[in-house]
Design a protein with these regions (language model features):
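Extended alpha-helical, oligomerization-prone segments that build pores/tubes and scaffolds
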Residues: 1-208
Length: 208
């Protein structure tokens, strides 16, 4: 029932599904191998199924399928509005990103770009004024978050020390992490990764 309802929504109510599907078929013919992402969009509050350009999807080397890859990275391009909406609804944490400043503030910074903090950071904020979308890396990987905390010299193997699947999103320009989300069912004792990517192969090849 859930699959039928999702299929009906995507093919009837989602106006962007078929234009996106046309691009998907074109890239499949050109590349022979493409990916699609099915997920819940926190901004529209609706399920979304969208094609991913091959250059924007990264997997581990020497894996035969995406299900066997320990790390999957989707390069996303978000507008200023999408970033702020994600921060407002709690999807992203509120972090200081220079390009979220107003255009006037960016111009003022350009005129006074000799400020010590800007020079030391090595970031040219004036370049942001020409960008309409900003790169974010959404990485699906297994992590042991206990490794980020100092537990002393003692270490014992338990269920909490095993790497678990998380979705980590970081800003491509500032390298700041904006989101870390658990990616398994709450009642799943094995903590199996929830996969939202679909791999399509037109021609068999030596690599994924």
């Amino acid at each position: 029932i859930t699959k039928d309802a999702l299929n009906e929504y995507l093919t009837i109510e989602d106006k962007g599904f078929y234009p996106d599907y046309d691009r998907f078929l074109l890239y499949l013919l050109l590349y022979g191998c493409v990916f699609r992402k099915v997920y819940y969009d926190s901004i529209t509050k609706k399920p979304i199924s969208r094609f991913i350009i091959p250059e924007d999807f990264l997997v581990d080397n020497n894996c035969s399928s995406i299900l066997e890859s320990n790390r999957l990275t989707h390069i996303r391009y978000l507008s200023k509005r999408e970033i702020l909406l994600n921060m407002q609804d709690g999807t992203f944490r509120s972090v200081a990103l220079d390009y979220l400043k107003s255009t006037n503030n960016i111009v003022d910074t350009e005129e006074n770009d000799l400020k010590e903090d800007d020079v030391n950071s090595g970031i040219d904020i004036s370049a942001y004024s020409t960008l309409s979308r900003f790169k974010f890396y959404e990485t699906h990987e297994y992590l042991d978050l206990n490794e980020f905390f100092d537990s002393g010299d003692t270490w014992e193997l338990d269920s909490n020390s095993l790497p678990s699947p998380y979705v980590i999103t970081r800003c491509g320009l500032s390298n700041k992490i904006v989101s870390i989300i658990p990616n398994w069912q709450e009642d799943d004792p094995t903590r199996t990764r929830i996969n939202c990517f679909v791999h399509y192969n037109l021609f068999p090849g030596f690599d994924i």
